[in-house]
UniProtKB/Swiss-Prot annotation:
Keywords: Cytokine, Cytoplasm, Inflammatory response, Lysosome, Mitogen, Pyrogen, Secreted
MF GO annotations: cytokine activity; integrin binding; interleukin-1 receptor binding
Protein name: Interleukin-1 beta
Localization annotation: Cytoplasm, Cytosol; Secreted; Lysosome; Secreted, Extracellular exosome
Residue numbers covered by the propeptide annotation in the UniProt entry: 1-118
Domain of life: Eukaryota
Lineage: Eukaryota, Metazoa, Chordata, Craniata, Vertebrata
Entry GO CC: cytosol; extracellular space; lysosome
Disulfide bonds: none
Subunit structure: Monomer. In its precursor form, weakly interacts with full-length MEFV; the mature cytokine does not interact at all. Interacts with integrins ITGAV:ITGBV and ITGA5:ITGB1; integrin-binding is required for IL1B signaling. Interacts with cargo receptor TMED10; the interaction is direct and is required for the secretion of IL1B mature form. Interacts with HSP90AB1; the interaction facilitates cargo translocation into the ERGIC. Interacts with HSP90B1; the interaction facilitates cargo translocation into the ERGIC.
One GO process term, biological-process aspect: positive regulation of type II interferon production
Site (Important for interaction with integrin) location in chain: 173, 181, 183, 192, 206
Comment field (misc): IL1B production occurs in 2 steps, each being controlled by different stimuli. First, inflammatory signals, such as LPS, stimulate the synthesis and promote the accumulation of cytosolic stores of pro-IL1B (priming). Then additional signals are required for inflammasome assembly, leading to CASP1 activation, pro-IL1B processing and eventually secretion of the active cytokine. IL1B processing and secretion are temporarily associated.
Family annotation (Pfam families): IL1 (PF00340), IL1_propep (PF02394)
Length: 270
């Protein structure tokens, strides 16, 4: 590591501090600085009057010794010395090239999943009705049913928290997770008795929702003419569906556009 040479007694006689760093932190610097560099048996750099003294005893050097190298070189640019050419920025670069060795920095590929919790996912509170105006209602704690509500019974309508999640799917579809607000009950798609089935799962609110949900909780939302439908990401071509009959369970069906209802209207909830 290079450092600024120790000041000679000749420099000390000019009334400056015996602290070597003070020579370079003065506003204008000592007028006869070049004398500090005349009697050292070190290599010259392009005969510009700059010398480097290499220290092999780094254990007793404070931070100020190393900082002095940079400060001193900046001061030398402003000091008048009998040189054929003024000290230039390129000359300073040559000094640093003698001191430091450049090494490449190899960046390892980062795992995107490690940063999914940096920011909470965006979500909306909303209510749903099928196109026959049947509302979705939580029934017996772990079952969703679709039925017509009126009067005071409208308060039974379930409020959902729709969370926008990350999925590598068709960009024309929006991946979301659906949770019954206040209950932490998430709609999920699982295989039961050889058939894709819709169910409700209670999840830890300290962990969920998250940006990358397990695939069984993800639905690809599509909106056409103010009507929305939700296709299971776990089971493509299977949709959240309701029956034409009253007060029947909401289920997962693959009869899109048929007798079963797969289109819903969405109302934002405050």
């Amino acid at each position: 590591m290079a450092r600024v040479p120790e000041p000679t007694s000749e420099v000390m006689s000019y009334g400056y501090s015996d602290n070597e760093n003070d020579l370079f932190f003065e506003a204008d610097g000592p007028g006869k600085m070049k004398c500090c560099f005349q009697d050292l048996n070190n290599s010259y750099l392009e005969e510009e009057g700059i010398q480097l003294q290499i220290s092999h005893q780094l254990h007793n050097k404070s931070l100020s010794h190393f900082v002095s190298v940079i400060v001193a070189l900046e001061k030398l640019k402003k000091i008048s010395v009998p040189c054929s050419l003024p000290l230039q920025g390129d000359d300073l670069m040559n000094v640093f090239h003698c001191i430091f060795e450049e090494e490449p920095i190899i960046l390892e590929k980062c795992d995107d999943n490690a940063f999914v919790h940096d920011a909470p996912p965006r979500s909306l509170d909303c209510k749903f009705q099928d196109i026959n105006q049947k509302s979705l209602v939580l029934y017996n704690s772990y079952e969703l049913r679709a039925l017509h509500l009126n009067g005071t019974s409208v308060n039974q309508q379930a409020v959902f928290r729709m969370t926008f999640v990350q999925e590598d799917e068709d960009i024309t579809k929006i991946p979301v997770a659906l949770c019954i607000k206040e209950k932490n009950l998430y709609l999920s798609c699982v295989m039961k008795d050889g058939k894709p089935t819709l169910q409700l799962e209670m999840l830890d609110p300290k962990v969920y929702p998250k940006k990358r949900m397990e695939k069984r909780f993800v639905f690809n939302k599509t909106e056409i003419k103010k009507k929305v439908e939700f296709e299971s990401s776990q089971f493509p071509n299977w949709y959240i569906s309701t029956s034409q009959a009253e007060a029947m369970p909401v289920f997962l069906g693959n009869n899109r556009g048929g007798h079963d209802i797969t289109d819903f209207t969405m109302e934002l909830s405050s």
